[in-house]
Swiss-Prot record:
Protein's name in the database: Protein TusC
Subcellular location, record wording: Cytoplasm
The gene coding this protein: tusC
Task performed by this protein: Part of a sulfur-relay system required for 2-thiolation of 5-methylaminomethyl-2-thiouridine (mnm(5)s(2)U) at tRNA wobble positions.
Disulfide bonds: none
Gene3D superfamilies in the record: DsrEFH-like
UniProt keyword annotations, A-Z: Cytoplasm, tRNA processing
Gene Ontology process terms (BP): tRNA processing
Organism listed in the record: Shigella flexneri
InterPro entries assigned: DsrEFH-like, Sulphur_relay_DsrE/F-like, Sulphur_relay_TusC, Sulphur_relay_TusC/DsrF
Family statement drawn from the similarity comment of this UniProt entry: Belongs to the DsrF/TusC family.
HAMAP family linked to this entry: Thiourid_synth_C
Domain of life: Bacteria
Amino acid sequence: MKRIAFVFSTAPHGTAAGREGLDALLATSALTDDLAVFFIADGVFQLLSGQKPDAVLARDYIATFKLLSLYDIEQCWVCAASLRERGLDPQTPFVVEATPLEADALRRELANYDVILRF
């Protein structure tokens, strides 16, 4: 079976991309165990707890990321450079345990996947 990478690169709640990506990720996990999740660029904001999406009339789907371990999704990576550029500390308690990687290491890891879906 092909290895599938899900890349979250957009901020939450501005569009439906993050919610749709999470739905696709959970659905795909029923079909294969060989997948990983990458958070890059503004997608690192998907990892922050304490968001208030109801203030902008959006659905609170961020807490659903906590279910990844129940779906046996354990390969989660976050771009360390994206965190720094946005003033976030890699030690911040995120809703998902994601391993920080520098951009070059992240690209190498991403190159190991056959299919890359970006949200």
